Amino acid sequence: MAKKDYYEILGVSRNATQEEIRQAYKKLIKKWHPDRNYENKKLAEEKFKEIQEAYEVLSDPEKRAMYDKFGYVGDVPPNAGGGFRGFGGFEDIFKDFGDFINNDIFNIFFGDQRTSSRKRTKTPRKGEDINISVDVSFEELFTGVKIPLEYDRYEVCEHCHGEGVEPGSGWVTCPKCHGTGTVREERRTFLGVIVNQYTCNQCGGTGKIPGESCRVCGGTGRIRKRHRIEVNIPAGVENGTILRIQGGGHAGYYGGGYGDLYVHVRVVGYTSFERKGNNLIKDLKIDYVDAILGTKVKIKMPDGKIKEVKIPSGVQHGQEIYVYGEGIPDMRTGRRGDLILRINVGIPTKVSRTEKKLLKEIAKLRGKDVRED
């Protein structure tokens, strides 16, 4: 039986940092989550468990060190402890000795790993988080918007109130550990009796198991339902902002708390404005005469309002005109940024004879040498 390469499963090198391992895990766990792979749920569940197993080992420095050194964590690998086949008694002796060296002495110094390699199936666990993307328009950044959301999630089973136990059946003593929460194993070797003790994997160390699993949820304490909420997108939200809705995720297992809902905001739609922080920037083209004499322009803001702005005489090409307090509200304080108009002075490529004559007169008044046609 080939051993699993946890590094290969997560797609990282053997020298990967904890942050690289964590990022790889987050990416893969989203990709292979069973709730996102309805068409091939069986494969997704297998991949999901495999990824969880790999991360459980590589994210723990002690377990990772053991894995790097021995190639496994927990129970003795299938091919360990063999030798001297065909010599009857000697085979058993050396098998015991191999088991002792590979398992019992290892556990004496490093602790029994079997508990951590198996998830406790009956203890409360928080539910998974849910990620959803929503689109908002540039105009909605000014006022904020409430968006109705509808999605599937696991909720607490109303029949058993999330306990996973059929009402009236109660809890009974675990038959494997007899209520102690731990299992004791004794093995006789030529060195004597070796004792192993580990957390019971049937009751998860609680010493109790359901008398009868809930007939509605199958013992998980949760069932799948359609959930509807209204999410408040605050004014001033930026593209790529992630809003956390506490308790909006899946219900936990066996009475565990709800996970969270993460709303990923995308700002969509065309606009002639550019956003920089909470400031709005707009390129404004004006005639050269207006640049010289000054003028007033009307700007249609993203929220539909019309703002009249005075352009001073003598404004230069590329100059920025600030209109204070007309930008986007800050998402936290509500204070608005500024509107910034970048002036683009338009020079005509052709003028009428009358205009040309007047311009020459102006040029002479300014002491310029004017070429006569």
Swiss-Prot record:
Binding partners and assembly: Homodimer.
Binding site for Zn(2+) 2: 174, 177, 200, 203
Zinc fingers (CR-type) by residue: 144-226
GO biological process: chaperone cofactor-dependent protein refolding; DNA replication; protein refolding; response to heat
Protein name listed in UniProt: Chaperone protein DnaJ
Keywords on record: Chaperone, Cytoplasm, DNA replication, Metal-binding, Repeat, Stress response, Zinc, Zinc-finger
Cofactor requirements of the protein: Zn(2+)
Disulfide bonds: none
Binding-site positions, Zn(2+) 1: 157, 160, 214, 217
Function: Participates actively in the response to hyperosmotic and heat shock by preventing the aggregation of stress-denatured proteins and by disaggregating proteins, also in an autonomous, DnaK-independent fashion. Unfolded proteins bind initially to DnaJ; upon interaction with the DnaJ-bound protein, DnaK hydrolyzes its bound ATP, resulting in the formation of a stable complex. GrpE releases ADP from DnaK; ATP binding to DnaK triggers the release of the substrate protein, thus completing the reaction cycle.
UniProt organism field: Thermosipho melanesiensis (strain DSM 12029 / CIP 104789 / BI429)
Location (main, coarse): cytoplasm
InterPro entries listed in its UniProt record: DnaJ, DnaJ_C, DnaJ_domain, DnaJ_domain_CS, HSP40/DnaJ_pept-bd, HSP_DnaJ_Cys-rich_dom, HSP_DnaJ_Cys-rich_dom_sf, J_dom_sf
Domain notes per entry: The J domain is necessary and sufficient to stimulate DnaK ATPase activity. Zinc center 1 plays an important role in the autonomous, DnaK-independent chaperone activity of DnaJ. Zinc center 2 is essential for interaction with DnaK and for DnaJ activity.
GO molecular function terms attached to this record: ATP binding; heat shock protein binding; unfolded protein binding; zinc ion binding
Higher taxonomy: Bacteria, Thermotogati, Thermotogota, Thermotogae, Thermotogales
Renumbered ranges of CXXCXGXG motif repeats: 157-164, 174-181, 200-207, 214-221
